[in-house]
Amino acid sequence: MSSSGGAPGASASSAPPAQEEGMTWWYRWLCRLSGVLGAVSCAISGLFNCITIHPLNIAAGVWMIMNAFILLLCEAPFCCQFIEFANTVAEKVDRLRSWQKAVFYCGMAVVPIVISLTLTTLLGNAIAFATGVLYGLSALGKKGDAISYARIQQQRQQADEEKLAETLEGEL
């Protein structure tokens, strides 16, 4: 019960870092939706992968089911309300920077593929890996367009040419 009393204060402190990174509300929801879909695909593929006698496929399937559980716990804690600490874990994950989430999610998705390279593991972990990629793209942030970049380069080039002309005139 004490964890539910501390949740509002913790969620208020975890909200500013996500907003400071410049993620829009729709991109944040896209990342969360991708995480939930990745968890579902990992769980289904992991169960399918466990129906075999090959031990590496079973290990990869168990890892994929664990990935599904962790993704749901981090991205959609309301799906794991039977676990007492689900909201606490989700709040701690929300405080992580986007690049940390990207490395974590991509790393989790690559391990079963390394264990057993099959079509089931590739397809099952594709959306989970895409979740990490989406968080990685948000870590890069919004970059300027090509036109603005070209203008800045042109201004720098003109400034360099003027400095070169001044130094040449000074030598003469």
UniProtKB/Swiss-Prot annotation:
<feature type="transmembrane region" description="Helical">
    <location>
        <begin position="126"/>
        <end position="142"/>
    </location>
</feature>
<feature type="transmembrane region" description="Helical">
    <location>
        <begin position="103"/>
        <end position="123"/>
    </location>
</feature>
<feature type="transmembrane region" description="Helical">
    <location>
        <begin position="58"/>
        <end position="78"/>
    </location>
</feature>
<keyword id="KW-1133">Transmembrane helix</keyword>
<keyword id="KW-0968">Cytoplasmic vesicle</keyword>
<dbReference type="GO" id="GO:0005789">
    <property type="term" value="C:endoplasmic reticulum membrane"/>
</dbReference>
<keyword id="KW-0812">Transmembrane</keyword>
<comment type="similarity">
    <text>Belongs to the calcium channel flower family.</text>
</comment>
<dbReference type="GO" id="GO:0005886">
    <property type="term" value="C:plasma membrane"/>
</dbReference>
<keyword id="KW-0967">Endosome</keyword>
<dbReference type="GO" id="GO:0008021">
    <property type="term" value="C:synaptic vesicle"/>
</dbReference>
<comment type="function">
    <text>Transmembrane protein which mediates synaptic endocytosis and fitness-based cell culling. In response to different stimulus strengths, controls two major modes of synaptic vesicle (SV) retrieval in hippocampal neurons; Clathrin-mediated endocytosis (CME) in response to mild stimulation and activity-dependent bulk endocytosis (ADBE) in response to strong stimulation. In cytotoxic T-lymphoocytes (CTLs) facilitates calcium-dependent endocytosis of cytotoxic granules at the immuno synapse.</text>
</comment>
<feature type="topological domain" description="Cytoplasmic">
    <location>
        <begin position="143"/>
        <end position="172"/>
    </location>
</feature>
<comment type="subunit">
    <text>Interacts with adaptor protein complex 2 (AP-2).</text>
</comment>
<dbReference type="InterPro" id="IPR019365">
    <property type="entry name" value="TVP18/Ca-channel_flower"/>
</dbReference>
<feature type="topological domain" description="Cytoplasmic">
    <location>
        <begin position="79"/>
        <end position="102"/>
    </location>
</feature>
<dbReference type="Pfam" id="PF10233">
    <property type="entry name" value="Cg6151-P"/>
</dbReference>
<feature type="topological domain" description="Extracellular">
    <location>
        <begin position="124"/>
        <end position="125"/>
    </location>
</feature>
<keyword id="KW-0333">Golgi apparatus</keyword>
<dbReference type="GO" id="GO:0005794">
    <property type="term" value="C:Golgi apparatus"/>
</dbReference>
<protein>
    <recommendedName>
        <fullName>Calcium channel flower homolog</fullName>
    </recommendedName>
</protein>
<keyword id="KW-0256">Endoplasmic reticulum</keyword>
<dbReference type="GO" id="GO:0055037">
    <property type="term" value="C:recycling endosome"/>
</dbReference>
<feature type="transmembrane region" description="Helical">
    <location>
        <begin position="33"/>
        <end position="53"/>
    </location>
</feature>
<keyword id="KW-0472">Membrane</keyword>
<dbReference type="GO" id="GO:0005769">
    <property type="term" value="C:early endosome"/>
</dbReference>
<feature type="topological domain" description="Extracellular">
    <location>
        <begin position="54"/>
        <end position="57"/>
    </location>
</feature>
<keyword id="KW-0770">Synapse</keyword>
<feature type="topological domain" description="Cytoplasmic">
    <location>
        <begin position="1"/>
        <end position="32"/>
    </location>
</feature>
<keyword id="KW-1003">Cell membrane</keyword>
<dbReference type="GO" id="GO:0016192">
    <property type="term" value="P:vesicle-mediated transport"/>
</dbReference>
